[in-house]
């Protein structure tokens, strides 16, 4: 399943259980307009409807950019005359957070504004050294939306979130990695190899167990977990064919072959 992009809107390509979404507007620092947001929501819906997709990689076209930018966030022209635009923007990271497959952000450039929340909405983030992170909401007079603030505090902690929002200053990725934000922080030359290894690592896990565990972790992080639902997921995994295969593979000292059952 490939969904062709409209002009320079985000593209979606699917191969071997991996869906790759690419932001591809480098001339405007991969900023996102309303059409892009609608495209992303449609792509998320298509991904959730395809049970063969087990990993989603979100990346950006940064080649030939003198200073690589993953995304500059919401295209500010879209705010003119539409004060509700941030409410529409938040639907993208909110939906991304709850995607069924495991999501990996291939953060191969600096990131700004609302795009930082898109990054935080991913389950795992592989980042490139030498880049920067900036949240200028208060610098343009905007109070950020609640779910975005929640993701910031959950993923970055209160102290770094305060530094990001209450100063509006740029923070180097190296500073954020000191707090454990990224799965790994690697050089440009190593980036693609590390990304491939991470994707393969996730693909090697039992799909039912890892997707159910993702949902349970999110439920717990939001502070009001449905214990009965989590226990039901646990019980389902214990009776699954994949759990039986995992135990057998461990006994036979081989890699398991999971079927998602």
What are the roles of these predicted feature ranges?
Residues 1-20, 24, 169-203, 211-222, ...:
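Amphipathic alpha-helical segments at domain termini/boundaries
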Residues 16, 21-24, 38-80, 96-105, ...:
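A structural preference for short, pocket-lining loop segments at secondary-structure junctions
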Residues 29-32, 79-82, 221-222, 259-260:
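A generic structural signal for short coil/turn motifs at secondary-structure boundaries
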Residues 35, 39, 88, 95, ...:
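Charged catalytic carboxylate motif
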Residues 50, 99-100, 240, 253-255:
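Acidic-histidine catalytic/liganding microenvironments
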Residues 77-90:
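A short acidic, glycine-rich active-site loop
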Residues 94-207, 245-248:
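Crotonase-fold acyl-CoA enzyme core
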Residues 164, 216-220, 233-238:
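Helix-loop "lid/cap" segments that line or gate small-molecule binding pockets
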């Amino acid at each position: 399943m490939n969904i062709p992009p409209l002009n320079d809107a985000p593209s979606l390509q699917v191969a071997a259980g991996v869906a790759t979404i690419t932001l591809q507007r480098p001339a405007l620092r991969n900023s996102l307009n309303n059409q892009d947001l609608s495209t992303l929501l449609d792509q998320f819906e298509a991904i959730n409807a395809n049970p063969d997709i087990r990993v989603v990689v979100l990346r950006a076209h940064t080649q030939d950019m003198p200073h690589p930018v993953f995304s500059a966030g919401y295209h500010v022209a879209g705010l003119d005359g539409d004060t509700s635009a941030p409410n529409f923007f938040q639907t993208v990271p909110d939906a991304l957070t709850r995607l069924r497959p495991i999501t990996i952000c291939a953060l191969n450039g600096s990131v700004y504004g609302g795009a930082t929340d898109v990054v935080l909405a991913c389950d795992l983030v592989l980042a490139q050294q030498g880049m920067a992170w900036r949240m200028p909401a208060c610098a343009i007079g905007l109070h950020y939306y609640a779910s975005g603030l929640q993701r910031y505090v959950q993923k970055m902690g209160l102290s770094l979130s305060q530094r990001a929002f209450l100063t509006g200053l740029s923070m180097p990725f190296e500073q954020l990695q000191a707090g454990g934000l990224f799965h790994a922080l690697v050089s440009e030359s190593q980036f693609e190899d590390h990304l491939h290894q991470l994707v393969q690592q996730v693909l090697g896990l039992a799909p039912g167990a890892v997707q159910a565990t993702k949902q349970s972790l999110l439920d717990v992080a939001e502070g009001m977990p449905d214990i009965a639902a989590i226990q039901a997921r646990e019980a389902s995994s214990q009776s699954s064919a994949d759990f039986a295969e995992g135990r057998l593979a461990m006994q036979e000292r081989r890699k398991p072959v999971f079927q998602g059952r």
